[in-house]
Structure formats: C-alpha cells, structure tokens
C-alpha cells in the first residue's frame, strides 16, 4: 500500500521527468492489496507484506518463505504469514541514536542447516561508538539469538552519530565484505590505519581475508579492502560473475556506485562529483591521479540506502540491472546495463508513493523486497503483474 501519513567516464543520473516519472496516481488501498503499476518494460504489483515496523533497515528471506527484518532502534523480527513476531531476544548492547542502531543482516550460505547469520550494528565503547560485525545462530523456535559473537569492531570509536555504513555481502568462498562510513569526519577515509571510510574483507571468523592489500598491518589495517568511501550503505556481489559493487552517499550531489578492488582508493574527500552542503567545493575536483572513478553517480543526490543486482527469474527484462533503494526521493532506481555491464539508462519507480526506501533485496523466487525507513515502516514485495 502507498505510504502512510568504475569507468573512465562514469555514468551520471540527472532528473528527467519524461524518462523517469510514472504517470500514475497512487491512492490508499487496504492492507495487503496489490497496487498495479506500469513500468517501461513490464507491469508490476506492489504488495504490503507487513506494516507497523519502526524504521526497518534490512530484510532477508528465510528458506521457508518467512523474512527476517531489522529495525534500527534495536529490534530483530521474524515476519511470517503477514505478521511480525515479538522482538527476537539476545541482541548485544547497541548504540541507538542518530543514524546508528541495528543495521544489516545476512544469512550464512549454510543457514538452512546451521541457522547461522551475520549482522552489523553501532555499539558503544571507549571514546564513543562505532560499527561492529557479529555472528549468531537463530534458535530453532525463532525467538532468540544464540552463540552471539562479535567478530570485528572498528578501531576508533568517536562521539559522532552518523555514517556507520553498513551492509554485508558474502562471497562464494564464504568471506564477508562490508562497509563503514567516515563517521562524519571525512579525512578519516584517507587514512589506511583507520577503519572509517573503507570496505573491509574478512573471513567468517572475523580475521582478515587472504587478499588483504595491507597484510601484516604496517601500511594499513589488514581488514581493509579499499579506502576513500564516504558512507557506503549498500554492497552486493553479482551472482553471475562475482563482481563486487557498492553504493554510497555523497554530500550535496555525488552519490556513487563503485566497483571496489583490493588496495584501490575511491577518493573521498579528495575528489567528488558533489559539493559540501554549504555549496563549497569538495577536495580538488572530480578526478585526480591515484583515485578511482565511480561507475555511476547521481547529481542531485538520491540518498541511496542499498543496492542489488537483478538475477532473478520473475523479471528477465531486468536481468543484470542494478536496483537501488533511495531515501531522498522515496524511489527505487533501476539502473539498466547492457550485456557488457555498461550502464545505458535509469528508470525511477515508485517515486514518492511508499516513503523512504532503505533496503532492496531480490528474493529467491525473483520478486523484489523493499523496506521503508519510516516510523510506521513497511515490508513490501514487488512481483510481476498477472495478465489482465
């Protein structure tokens, strides 16, 4: 239901109503009713799975068709048959404030047998708060987390309440990628001895992955995979070829899709396609030697909260396209790519209809899951509309 009250020449998105807008007025409908919407290539239906969530941040589909949903204020719920459970017990002590709280959740590849999952959160500690990664086991009765273990925490906690990152992507080898923002102190993103403003790569036990560009730690923290990131809140591995992509918030303009590679520097705050909120220039321009270019950027910003690559069966027309959940314009961006992976266009869906879109995930059946970052947030499902 609608909301309640790295290329040499990166692709750029600018608002074009004729191309991106949907000439469709969405009106309130009863809960669980489907809203039918025409897009450029296919008709879709949007259905509310459950409402009444408080600032949901992440969703994962369970093997039996239920869902796990995190709420930023510090709750994890199981959604089954259109009903959200009582909060799952066993979460560690969190820092909840500003942009911090319970953040992403990801199932271990062997979850069906092990019940293991990972989650990120902001936690309190010496000096303030910072981002941490945890592993746990969901109990068989789905009421509590067991064997909760903190695998990793960033090495410098501060009192700021923003730019914690942080989503998780799991590689075919079981290793974990996740991002941490600059924590609102932009120069930290250029310090390889500081975990802030970086993409990290860890083994399932929290130790640095074998491909660490800073192995040994003498030139940088060994968990760091790439640097120069402002606030990466989306991360995904393309299941077709294993390519890693991130999406991150710019300032006033300059949101980016990046393709991180080990040891590379993505420029923040030395280069950016945006400006400071004051209107002042950032760094030394939009490009400079030694810094990687994004594969795509937005000006003005859309405030991207998550990214996935569509590889499902339900929408073959969208195969290989990026799906980006956006907060600022309350939209789902479909970034069209050709067979070579080059970006060829963008379609903006659901703009202003459901609220701030925080997460997007392709479900096992090819449907698309969204959560809305609102006080009265929703878990939504996009499916292919039946033939009229």
What name fits each language-model region?
Residues 344-364:
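Conserved blade-ending motifs and adjacent loop-strand segments that build the rim/top face
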Residues 16-29:
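Bacterial N-terminal signal peptides
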Residues 132-141, 193-204, 260:
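Beta-propeller blade signature
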Residues 47-48, 85-92, 144-153, 210-214, ...:
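Beta-propeller fold detector
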Residues 33-45, 143-145, 207-217, 273-289, ...:
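Blade/loop signatures of beta-propeller domains
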Residues 178-196, 254-256, 260:
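Short, conserved, GDST-rich strand-edge loop motifs in beta-rich repeat architectures
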Residues 33-186, 234-250, 300-339, 363-384:
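Acidic, Gly/Ser/Thr-rich repeat motifs that build Ca2+-stabilized beta-propeller blades
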Residues 2-19:
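Bacterial N-terminal signal peptides that target proteins for export
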């Amino acid at each position: 239901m609608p909301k309640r009250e790295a290329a040499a020449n990166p692709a750029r998105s600018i608002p074009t109503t004729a191309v991106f807008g949907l000439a469709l007025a969405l009106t309130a409908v009863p809960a669980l009713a489907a809203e039918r919407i025409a897009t450029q290539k296919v008709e879709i239906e949007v259905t509310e799975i459950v409402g009444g969530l408080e600032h949901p941040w992440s969703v994962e589909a369970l093997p039996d068709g239920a869902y796990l949903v995190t709420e930023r204020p510090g709750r994890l719920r199981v959604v089954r048959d259109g009903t959200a459970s009582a909060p799952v017990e066993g979460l560690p002590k969190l820092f909840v404030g500003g942009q911090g709280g319970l953040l992403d959740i990801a199932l271990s590849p062997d979850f069906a047998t092990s019940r293991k999952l990972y989650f990120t959160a902001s936690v309190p500690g010496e000096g303030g708060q910072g981002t941490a990664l945890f592993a746990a086991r969901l109990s068989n009765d789905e009421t509590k987390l067991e064997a909760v273990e903190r695998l990793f925490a960033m090495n410098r906690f501060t009192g700021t309440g923003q730019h914690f990152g942080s989503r998780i992507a799991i590689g075919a080898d079981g290793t974990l990628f996740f991002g941490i923002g600059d924590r609102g102190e932009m120069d930290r993103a250029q310090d390889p001895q500081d975990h802030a403003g970086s993409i990290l790569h860890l083994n399932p036990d929290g130790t640095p992955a074998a491909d660490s560009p800073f192995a040994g730690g003498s030139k940088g923290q060994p968990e760091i995979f790439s640097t120069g990131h402002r606030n990466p809140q989306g991360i995904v591995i393309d299941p077709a070829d294993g390519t890693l992509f991130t999406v991150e918030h710019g300032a006033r303009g300059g949101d980016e899709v990046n393709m991180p590679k080990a040891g590379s520097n993505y420029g923040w705050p030395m280069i950016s396609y945006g400006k400071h909120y004051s209107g002042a220039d950032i760094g030394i321009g939009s490009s400079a030697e030694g810094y990687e270019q994004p594969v795509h950027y937005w000006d003005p910003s859309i405030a991207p909260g998550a990214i996935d690559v569509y590889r499902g069966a339900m929408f073959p027309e969208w195969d290989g396209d990026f799906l980006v959940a956006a907060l600022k314009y309350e939209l789902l961006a479909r970034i069209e790519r050709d067979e070579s992976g080059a970006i060829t266009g963008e379609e903006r869906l659901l703009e202003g209809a459901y609220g701030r879109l925080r997460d997007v995930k392709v479900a096992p059946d090819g449907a698309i899951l969204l959560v809305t970052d609102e006080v009265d947030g929703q878990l939504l499902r996009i499916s292919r509309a039946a033939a009229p």
